[in-house]
């Protein structure tokens, strides 16, 4: 993993089993950053408690939002994300930053398990939009793990730079490390 991965935040998600239409035999479930297949715990953006990456700075903030909005977290899995400091658009890598109007102060978990890397579209340049590995079925063309994620940063970066994501959703594309975290 490159040293340029930045703590981006947390999300509680309802992990979906592999959809029948996804032609990727190794995939069992979807740990994507996007909410297209595995849904977030709530339609959280309207609560305005997210950070500049449109994720949450800590699990405690997710719990507080769920409590305030009477949303049950039962059945959700907790994920922590780190983002590569550059996004890919127009055939080159460019630096980007979190949305500055939101405070971003991510609490890095003491314990986490790397599940793989996801490539996520950010056409509007704020919140995660689509994960083409699951949303567009690219997991059927690229080597992914049981969670529909790429096995390494190098695989993700090379796949993006070589144009493997070009015919999916419009970019820019950002690379995220996806970690499982235990609810404590």
Where is each model-derived feature located?
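Short aromatic-glycine-(Arg/Gly/Cys) micro-motifs in beta-strand/loop hairpins
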Residues: 2-52, 99-145, 171-179
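Short, mixed-charge low-complexity intrinsically disordered segments
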Residues: 49-103, 147-149, 155-184
């Amino acid at each position: 993993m490159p040293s340029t991965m930045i703590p981006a935040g947390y999300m509680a998600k309802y992990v979906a089993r592999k959809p029948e239409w996804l032609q990727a035999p190794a995939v069992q479930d979807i740990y994507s950053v996007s909410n297209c297949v595995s849904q977030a715990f709530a339609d959280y953006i309207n609560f305005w408690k997210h950070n500049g990456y449109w994720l949450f700075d800590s699990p405690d903030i997710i719990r507080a939002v769920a409590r305030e909005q009477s949303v049950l977290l039962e059945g959700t899995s907790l994920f922590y994300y780190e983002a590569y400091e550059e996004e890919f658009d127009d055939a080159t890598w460019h630096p980007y930053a979190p949305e500055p109007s939101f405070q971003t102060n991510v609490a890095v978990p003491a314990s986490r398990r790397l599940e793989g890397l996801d490539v996520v579209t950010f056409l509007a340049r704020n919140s995660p939009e689509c994960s083409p590995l699951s949303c567009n079925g690219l997991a059927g063309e690229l080597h992914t793990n049981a969670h529909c994620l790429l096995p390494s940063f190098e695989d993700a970066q090379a796949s993006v730079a070589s144009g493997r994501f070009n015919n999916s959703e419009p970019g820019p594309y950002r690379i995220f490390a996806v970690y499982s975290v235990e609810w404590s």
